[in-house]
From Swiss-Prot:
Homodimer. HAMAP family: GTP_cyclohydrol_A. The record marks C167 as: May be catalytically important. PANTHER family: GTP CYCLOHYDROLASE MPTA. Pfam families: GCHY-1. It catalyses: GTP + H2O = 7,8-dihydroneopterin 2',3'-cyclic phosphate + formate + diphosphate + H(+). It comes from Methanosarcina mazei (strain ATCC BAA-159 / DSM 3647 / Goe1 / Go1 / JCM 11833 / OCM 88) (Methanosarcina frisia). This is GTP cyclohydrolase MptA. The keyword Protein biosynthesis does not apply. The lineage of its organism: Archaea, Methanobacteriati, Methanobacteriota, Stenosarchaea group, Methanomicrobia.
Amino acid sequence: MEKCTFNLPDVQASKPSIAINLTRVGVTNMKKLVEIKRKDKRPIVLISTFDVFVDLPSDRKGANLSRNFEAVDEVLEKVLSTPVYEIEQLCSDIAHNLLGRHEYANQAEVRMKSEYMIRRASPSTGIKCQEVVNIFAEASAVRGNGDRDYFDVKKLIGAEVVGMTACPCAQEIMRDKAATELANLGVERDKIIKFLEKVPMATHNQRGRGIISIKVAHDFDVSLESIIKIIERSMSSSVYEVLKRSDEKVVVETAHMNPKFVEDCVRAMADNVVKEFPNLPDNAVITIKQTNEESIHRHNAFAERVALMGELRKEISQ
């Protein structure tokens, strides 16, 4: 007796009732365990969330979404056998793989975000602790106009770091108040000046959140560790999970000796990006953001700069 076989219909390949292109079709919030190997160091293990998309032409009802999962898993297996790897390269490879699987698509996008644990030591006692940094990466792949086998790939890497800022404006008000009171007590002017130089005045503080992202072509690499350090240095002080009293003294004194507006933080990040990445091309896209969560206001303060690397170089060199 012959076995009956059935050809299952490919519903996704059928024509839609409304024939329009769709910019993005895919899956979001895909959880994956990612192990990134590093040269001469222990691997980084991340629990990551992926958003994966392709565009859809007007003559297809739907995309083959299972291919998105296949593309991600295939690249993750590749990562395990590669000596050194970067998360933006991971996204780039997934985007490239997606276009190979979705022959009807002209572009693919991959977004990844994760929490990255870094080790810290408190500034005075040296107590070891772990700090969480939010990291993210993106990649896009676009087919060439004349060659469907050529993919133009761009990738992005970035981080968000929490720190502390001290307000310069309120501090100057308190400095003037202290100088007046000391003068009324008969303290000599030169002694007042020396005192104010050594002892930082009170001001209100903010918890700052700095973000830097750098978008480059597929053949350039950007150090995530360098991005994190730049953001940390841009604020009045770093913050720590565990602090003893001597540590608290150092953190508070450091912050109040280095007061900064939200605008100062963005400009400091821009300056350090130019210094830290001299080999980046002029067409690299730099996005810098700073949000300060105010302590004496109900609102937050925000500043941002988006520019090409060449534009920043030109401005800072003037």
